């Protein structure tokens, strides 16, 4: 069903039985939000980010095979995986976080994804990432963490299918530690093993074994890896990734080795954000679920999870995260939408936990229950999908007045011109610096989004507003599934 605008300022819920089951469509201030359509398109965007040999069922007609020789420099097949954003580099840390959060969405909202017909697409998106990471982790005590030269890549504006820039390879090992990425990859493998446990037991077991080995590598050879700087520097250190990985490994194995780590070794912290670089809040909410299920000695994690909510929730006396006049949380310019979708998902997941156990959160003298958390999560998603002062969607190809100039190489270069013999400087003149809509629609991409005053510039060269990222979408999938199937 197409998105369309209606009249009136009341909220109308229309439950329609369509091809894929129940679809929830909401009218907010005259704009109808088709959550099922947004969910479908969110997953299509992830397909647009695929690297390697594309499958026959590829749903993005303007994408083709790319980077088939990745890893050749180190005699390892490193084809596959995802490009993180609008460029053609494969960064291990944000890619692994993309897979972990997509797996979490799929585990938490499996029933809703099945009801909306998107469960298999979500699993396929996860497997595209885990297949790649299995290649990256094919050698003992070593993990390949990046393919491509970001400095060279950023000097050229070319489709991945036609790129000529170097495909250099970076790695971590027991000799060159990189605790953040090793632990994040362990988390991705562990979470994904749960997704495939009852679908492909052999594959799930393989993922879990890799998760255990990588966690051991991360924990035994501690050190921050800065090879991806200045593009994906870990500013938060590695303690959050270690907690995150241990939490997922405990969920996947119920082995008390990982629970013991969380109780006696882990170093946690009070935070107000959840992102590819800062995982504490996600782990704290997962651990809070364990507390409600009867686990002892973990109370600090619940205090920290509650603090995360109190820091973000308007109306809380401890509210500290800036909210725009239009109601969107804003932590910093540059892919701010990642914090919007991440916070929405954590609030949604925590709301489910609170509702199941009939619990509330106390922020000083104020108490909040699951309905408060879910209302805030929904408001953040609705903002992205069109309920905002600009009256426009920030998802490409969806809703009212969606963006046309995503900062994205593949989307902006016309297929029939892609083989033009242009130098890198001229590629920017030809395809980057023109104020025209992209030649190819980057369907489903949630862009960086507006600034602190709800202002947005739909221009390719204003990347802080218009660049998409896989981890913005991956973590939106769960809450979109919940809203679509409500």
Curated annotation (Swiss-Prot):
* TM regions (residue ranges): none
Would you tell me the Gene Ontology cellular component terms?
Answer: extracellular region
Active-site feature positions: 87, 407, 458, 467
Q: Tell me which domain of life the UniProt entry assigns to the organism this sequence originates from.
A: Eukaryota
Enzyme's top EC category:
hydrolase
Catalysed reaction(s)? Answer: Endohydrolysis of (1->4)-beta-D-glucosidic linkages in cellulose, lichenin and cereal beta-D-glucans
Q: What is its main location?
A: secreted
Q: Name one GO molecular function term.
A: cellulase activity
Q: Name one GO biological process term.
A: cell wall organization
Q: Which range is the signal sequence, renumbered to this chain? A: 1-30
Which controlled-vocabulary keywords does the entry list?
Answer: Carbohydrate metabolism, Cell wall biogenesis/degradation, Cellulose degradation, Glycoprotein, Glycosidase, Hydrolase, Polysaccharide degradation, Secreted, Signal
Give the EC number(s) under which this enzyme is classified. 3.2.1.4
Name where it's found: Secreted
Q: In the UniProt record, which residues carry a glycan? A: 29
Q: Hey, which family's this protein in?
A: Belongs to the glycosyl hydrolase 9 (cellulase E) family.
Q: What is this protein called?
A: Endoglucanase 16
């Amino acid at each position: 069903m197409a998105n369309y605008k209606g009249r009136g300022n009341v909220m109308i819920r229309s439950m329609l039985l369509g091809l894929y089951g129940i679809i929830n469509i909401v009218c907010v201030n005259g704009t109808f939000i088709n959550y099922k359509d947004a969910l479908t398109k969110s997953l299509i965007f992830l397909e647009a980010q695929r690297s390697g040999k594309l499958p026959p069922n590829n749903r993005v007609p303007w994408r083709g095979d790319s980077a088939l020789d990745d890893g050749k420099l180190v005699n390892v097949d490193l084809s596959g995986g995802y490009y993180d954003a609008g460029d053609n580099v494969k960064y291990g840390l944000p890619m692994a976080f993309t897979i972990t959060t997509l797996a979490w969405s799929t585990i938490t909202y499996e029933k809703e994804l099945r009801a909306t017909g998107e469960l298999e697409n979500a699993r396929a998106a996860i497997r595209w990432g885990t297949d790649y990471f299995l290649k990256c982790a094919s050698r003992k005590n070593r993990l390949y963490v990046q393919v491509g030269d970001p400095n060279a890549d950023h000097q050229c504006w070319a489709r991945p299918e036609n790129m000529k820039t170097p495909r250099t390879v970076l790695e971590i090992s027991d000799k060159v530690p990189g605790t953040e990425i090793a632990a994040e990859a362990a988390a991705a493998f562990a979470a994904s093993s749960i997704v495939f446990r009852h679908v492909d037991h052999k594959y799930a077991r393989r993922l879990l074994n890799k998760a255990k080995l990588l966690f051991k590598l991360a924990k035994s050879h501690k050190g921050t890896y800065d090879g991806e700087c200045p593009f994906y520097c870990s500013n938060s250190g590695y303690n959050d990734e270690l907690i995150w990985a241990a939490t997922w490994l405990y969920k996947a194995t119920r082995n008390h080795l990982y629970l013991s780590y969380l109780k006696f070794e882990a170093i946690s912290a009070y935070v107000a954000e959840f992102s590819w670089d800062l995982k504490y809040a996600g782990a704290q909410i997962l651990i809070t679920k364990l507390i409600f299920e009867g686990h002892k000695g973990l109370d600090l994690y619940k205090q920290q999870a509650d603090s995360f909510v109190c820091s973000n929730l308007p109306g809380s006396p401890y509210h500290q995260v800036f909210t725009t006049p239009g109601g969107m949380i804003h932590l910093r310019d540059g892919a701010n939408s990642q914090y919007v979708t991440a916070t929405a998902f954590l609030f949604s997941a925590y709301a489910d936990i609170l509702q199941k156990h009939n619990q509330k959160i106390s922020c000083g003298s104020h108490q909040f229950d699951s309905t408060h958390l879910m209302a805030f999560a929904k408001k953040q998603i609705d903002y992205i999908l069109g309920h905002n002062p600009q009256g426009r969607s920030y998802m490409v190809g969806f809703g009212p007045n969606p963006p046309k100039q995503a900062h994205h190489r593949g989307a902006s270069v016309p297929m029939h011109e892609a083989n033009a013999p242009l130098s890198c400087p001229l590629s920017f003149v030809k395809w980057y610096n023109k104020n025209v809509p992209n030649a190819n629609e980057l369907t489903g991409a949630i862009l960086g989004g507006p600034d602190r005053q709800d202002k947005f510039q739909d221009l390719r060269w204003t990347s802080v507003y218009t660049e998409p990222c896989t981890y913005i979408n991956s973590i939106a999938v769960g809450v979109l599934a919940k809203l679509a199937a409500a």
